[in-house]
A protein has these predicted regions:
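Active-site beta-strand->loop->alpha-helix modules in alpha/beta enzyme cores, enriched
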Residues: 1-114, 161
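The feature marks non-catalytic terminal segments
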Residues: 34-53, 61-67, 78-83, 112-203
Length: 203
């Protein structure tokens, strides 16, 4: 199951990232196009899709940071409970405010549960900014145990198909990240196990 947390949108037209990259001025149309990309990527990986209707930051905060953090945390708790998953993979949260708040909320949600939890490095942000990876890991390490796992390569053909499913974003990311974006297709994935501070590594 691949869950997009911030998949909500307001009515009417909006000139944000989703509309700019899809070429669709109406927020609903732009986000439905993005959901179709989610589905294509998930099919390439043999996964199912799930969306939570909380708007991304591009549509305006609508609430204080603490209120938004709590709402996201509660939505993740509910999603984990209803899907009965045994493990959760969380973005490390490197640069984008949406990634960071989702990472923070997810860590709060899953560390209070019995679900096995992991963080992963978002590409190409991690390749382009390795210093941020180290700083973020140190920050997370102040609230939980963080244990590096062996890098994972996986099926590069399926990975390429999944990345290219996001046709509305690929060109923009390619221009913005250049060689670092090219590495998305070949670099191994990086993961860390996260555990409550008092939990033993064998649990």
């Amino acid at each position: 199951m691949i869950t997009t947390i911030l998949a909500g949108f307001p009515p009417g037209e909006h000139a944000g990232w989703s509309s700019q990259t899809t070429g669709l001025s109406v927020a609903e149309d732009a986000n439905l196009a993005r959901r179709e990309e989610d589905q294509r990527a998930s099919r390439a990986l043999g996964a199912r899709t799930n969306w939570i209707d909380i708007p991304a930051q591009e549509y305006g905060p609508g609430a204080s940071t603490s209120e938004r953090l709590l709402r996201i945390e509660q939505s993740i708790v509910a999603a984990v409970s209803t899907t009965e998953v045994r493990s959760v993979f969380i973005p490390l949260g490197l640069t984008h405010p949406d990634h960071i708040i989702v990472s923070d909320a997810a860590l709060r949600a899953v560390l209070a549960s019995d679900v096995e939890s992991y963080v992963y490095m978002e590409m190409p942000y991690g390749q382009a900014r390795p210093g941020r990876v180290r700083r973020r890991l140190r920050r997370i390490g102040r609230q939980c145990n963080v244990d590096p796992l062996e890098s994972f390569v996986g099926d590069l053909r399926r990975k390429s198909e999944a990345v290219n499913a996001y046709s509305s974003q690929v060109e923009t990311l390619q221009r913005g990240f250049g060689k670092y974006f090219d590495r998305v297709f070949t670099d191994p994935e990086r993961y860390w196990r996260v555990r409550p501070l008092l939990q033993s590594p064998n649990r």
